[in-house]
Amino acid sequence: MLIVADENIPLLDAFFAGFGEIRRVPGRSIDRATVEQADVLLVRSVTNVNRALLEGSKVRFVGTCTIGTDHLDLDYFNEAGITWSSAPGCNARGVVDYVLGSLMTLAEIEGVDLRERTYGVIGAGEVGGRLIKVLKGLGWNVKVCDPPRQAAEGGDYVSLEQIIAQCDVISLHTPLTRSGDGATWHLFDEQRLQQLKPGAWLINAARGPVVDNTALREVLLEREDLQAVLDVWEAEPQVDVSLAELCVLATPHIAGYSLDGKQRGTAQIYQAYCDFIGEPASIQLGDLLPAPWLSEVSLHADSDPAWALAMLCRGVYDPRRDDADFRRTLLGSVGEQRAAFDVLRKQYPSRREIEGLKVRIEGDSPALRQIVAALGAVAV
């Protein structure tokens, strides 16, 4: 059996070597010739898997080690009888850590108290839902916009217009959809960007085209009061350099790139494939994850809560390093920039999640206990 897989998927041998030959290919280079004789195709979001790629091939199972599925033609899969699986929630915590690290950096730059801001989360799925839980756990004022969930479940949701009018911080966590009433392509167009509150922060760690990049560039040039954090780009791996230069933080689509998240994605696809072939899963991710480099932190009960929160978040993940690495690649030609975008992702250093961090509090501090619980860290 032949398994064609994106070369950047971790733990391929550990999970899939027992099933057959693994052929590793750069994700953007996977084409019809590559998959023609493949039985299984394993991809990430950089590979569009559709009729043009698969028709006439032997592929019967497609797995994407990502939360999103906008790069998969699910209608064609159903028509062709191809079983598929994504990895819902696999990197959700990594994205939450990215947003938290970004908030800590913005607060330091702007000199603001994060407790006094109003937060708007657009999209309450795997990522947005976890972020909402953390922010509310910290006792912060959070408003949520998710029209599909509101229609299906009811609940305490607000409109997009209310988010824009009332929120100081807006974090985007929607899938990318191009048609229908809930289309998210260019959800933030020039009109909505112009309507942002004075001094608002906009964070996009969802999909690049959710924000009109050209419009955002023009609005940032006009309104110096706004701050933008972008991890995703409309034409990636090509990046609008002039837009990146206007962002307070700019990174190459690595928000969810925690080691835990990447390996969790492979584990979920492995489980799905075992279900597909009717065999029990014999390999467990917990047996493969290495020990985190930062495993335990001690805080004195007298520690300032705002300082402790920033220290815990940025101790696990500080986006400024990724921002600096990314900006260095923007000095080359367009071709060099495109290549560097993928190199940064392929060679991304090991990064762990805050949920694996043990926190010891010396003495009694309800405020610190609240922070540790909200972050999902382990109190010891």
Swiss-Prot record:
InterPro entries (alphabetical): D-isomer_2_OHA_DH_cat_dom, D-isomer_DH_CS, D-isomer_DH_NAD-bd, Erythronate-4-P_DHase, Erythronate-4-P_DHase_dimer, NAD(P)-bd_dom_sf, PdxB_dimer_sf
Main function: Catalyzes the oxidation of erythronate-4-phosphate to 3-hydroxy-2-oxo-4-phosphonooxybutanoate.
Subcellular location: Cytoplasm
Membrane-crossing segments per the record: none
Gene3D superfamilies: 3.30.1370.170, NAD(P)-binding Rossmann-like Domain
EC supergroup of this enzyme: oxidoreductase
Name of the gene: pdxB
Quaternary structure, from the entry: Homodimer.
Annotated protein name in UniProt: Erythronate-4-phosphate dehydrogenase
Pathway: Cofactor biosynthesis; pyridoxine 5'-phosphate biosynthesis; pyridoxine 5'-phosphate from D-erythrose 4-phosphate: step 2/5
